[in-house]
From Swiss-Prot:
Protein's recorded name: L-rhamnonate dehydratase
Gene it is expressed from: rhmD
Binding site for Mg(2+): 215, 241, 269
EC number(s) stated in the UniProt entry for this protein: 4.2.1.90
Subunit structure: Homooctamer; tetramer of dimers.
GO biological process terms on file: amino acid catabolic process; carbohydrate catabolic process
Length: 395
C-alpha cells in the first residue's frame, strides 16, 4: 500500500496589486468607476469603490508543503488578517495530518472558528487553505483537480464576460455580457433613467440575442430593484444580479416574485457555506446561485452547496475565481457555463483573471476553453516569482 504523505508546514503570505484581490487596480480601471455600491448613499464614496476601502485587504497566499517537499498553494482575498488566522490558528489542524484528510481538516477549521467566524474573512481564509490542499493533493497524485472531483462532464467550458463593454465581449466570442450598474437609489429618478438608458444603448449595440445582465453589487432595495427589473424587461435583460444586501433573504424572495416573467434573479457572491446557501434556496430567493469558491468555503464546501442547489433545481454559476472555479464547473451538470472577469483596464481584451500573480493561468479563446487547458496537476498554475511575497506572521 502506498504511504500517504503528511503535511509538513503551512505558510501564509500577503501580496498587493491585482490578482485575487481584483479590486486592487490602478487609476482608470473600469472596475473602480462610478459603480452602484451600498456606500453610494454617501456622496463622498460614490465616485470610486476604492474610496471606501474595497482594496484594503489585498491577497492572501497559502502554501502547504508535504513530507516529500511538494507544495500546494492557493490565492484568495484577506491579506494580513487572514495570514494571522492561518499561522496562529488554522495551521495546527494541518501540520502532521495526511494530505488526504481534507474533509476532517475543513470541519476542524470551521468548528474551531465558529465563535468569531462563520462568514466573511474567516471563511475566505478557510477557503484559501482548502484550495491549497486540493492543489497539493493533485500534485501528489499527478492529476488535475477536476479529476479528483470525479471527472469532467464536458469537454469544453463556455463563458460569459463581466466588464464595462459587453459589446466588445460579444466580438470576442462570449455568450453574454454582464455590466456594472452605475447608479443606485441615492441618485434618484435621474439615476434610474440613466441605468435604463445605458442598458438600452448596449442592447442596440449587441442585437436581440446576446445575453445582457446587470451586476448591482448589493446596492439596491426591493422597490428600486423591482422598478429597475420592470424597466429593463423592454431591453431583454437576462438576469439582475446581487440586487440586495446578502443578508436580506426576505427581500430576495419578494424580488423574485416581482420581476417580469422570464427574468432571472441571481445572487450568492457574498454568501458563505452550505447553511447560507440553504437559506437562499429554501426561501426561493433566486434562480441561480453564484458562490465564489475563494470566499464560500473552498472546493470542499462548494461541492455541498452545489448538491443542495441541484436538489432545488437551481444552477450554480460560480463568481469569478479563475482556475479554482474552472475545475469545479467542468465536473458539475448544474454548472453549464462560467464567468470570466474582464480584467483589462478598459475591458477591451482577454487577459488572465489573476494576472500578474499566477503563471500558466488559462483564458477563454473565442469565449470557450477546452478541457485540455486544465490538464496539469492540481490547479495547473504557479506563483509568479516576480511578485514579492511577504510573510507577516510565523508559528
Amino acid at each position: 500500500m502506498t504511504q500517504i504523505p503528511t503535511i509538513k508546514q503551512v505558510r501564509a503570505f500577503t501580496l498587493k496589486g491585482g490578482g485575487a484581490d481584483y479590486h486592487d487596480q490602478s487609476d482608470g480601471h473600469w472596475i473602480d468607476d462610478h459603480i452602484a455600491t451600498p456606500m453610494a448613499k454617501y456622496p463622498e464614496y460614490r465616485q470610486s469603490r476604492r474610496s471606501f476601502g474595497i482594496n484594503v485587504l489585498g491577497t492572501l497566499v497559502v502554501e502547504i508543503e508535504d513530507s516529500a517537499g511538494r507544495v500546494g498553494f492557493a490565492v484568495t482575498t484577506g491579506g494580513e488578517p487572514a495570514a494571522y488566522i492561518v499561522e496562529k490558528h488554522l495551521a495546527r489542524f494541518l501540520e502532521g495530518a495526511r494530505v488526504t484528510d481534507i474533509e476532517r481538516i475543513w470541519d476542524q477549521m470551521y468548528l474551531s472558528t465558529l465563535y468569531y467566524g462563520r462568514k466573511g474573512i474567516v471563511i475566505n481564509t478557510i477557503s484559501g487553505v482548502d484550495l491549497a490542499l486540493w492543489d497539493l493533493l493533485g500534485k501528489v497524485r499527478g492529476e488535475p483537480v477536476h479529476q479528483l472531483l470525479g471527472g469532467a462532464v464536458r469537454d469544453e467550458l463556455q463563458f460569459y464576460a463581466t466588464g464595462a463593454r459587453p459589446d466588445l465581449a460579444q466580438k470576442m466570442g462570449f455568450i453574454g455580457g454582464k455590466m456594472p450598474l452605475h447608479h443606485g437609489p441615492a441618485e434618484g429618478e435621474e439615476g434610474l433613467r440613466r441605468n435604463l438608458q445605458e442598458l438600452a444603448t448596449m442592447r442596440e449595440r449587441v442585437g436581440p440575442d446576446f445575453w445582457l445582465m446587470l451586476d448591482c453589487w448589493m446596492s439596491l432595495d426591493v422597490n428600486y430593484a423591482t422598478r429597475l427589473a420592470q424597466g429593463a424587461q423592454a431591453h431583454g435583460l437576462k438576469w439582475i444580479e446581487e440586487a440586495l444586501p446578502p443578508d436580506d433573504y426576505w427581500g430576495y424572495a419578494a424580488l423574485r416574485k416581482n420581476v417580469p416573467t422570464g427574468m432571472l434573479v441571481t445572487t450568492g457572491e457574498h454568501e458563505a457555506t452550505r447553511w447560507g446557501f440553504r437559506q437562499l434556496l429554501e426561501m426561493g430567493c433566486c434562480d441561480i446561485i453564484q458562490p465564489d469558491v475563494g470566499w464560500c468555503g473552498g472546493i470542499t464546501e462548494l461541492l455541498k452547496i452545489s448538491a443542495l442547489a441541484d436538489a432545488h433545481q437551481a444552477l450554480v454559476i460560480p463568481h469569478g475565481s479563475s482556475v479554482y472555479s474552472y475545475h469545479f464547473v467542468a465536473t458539475r451538470h448544474n454548472s453549464p457555463f462560467a464567468e470570466f472577469l474582464m480584467m483589462a483596464p478598459k475591458a477591451d481584451e482577454v487577459v488572465p483573471m489573476f494576472h500578474p500573480q499566477l503563471l500558466g493561468e488559462p483564458v477563454p479563446v473565442n469565449g470557450r476553453m477546452r478541457l485540455s487547458a486544465l490538464d496539469r496537476p492540481g490547479f495547473g498554475v504557479e506563483l509568479n516569482p516576480e511578485c514579492a511575497l511577504h510573510r507577516p506572521y510565523t508559528h
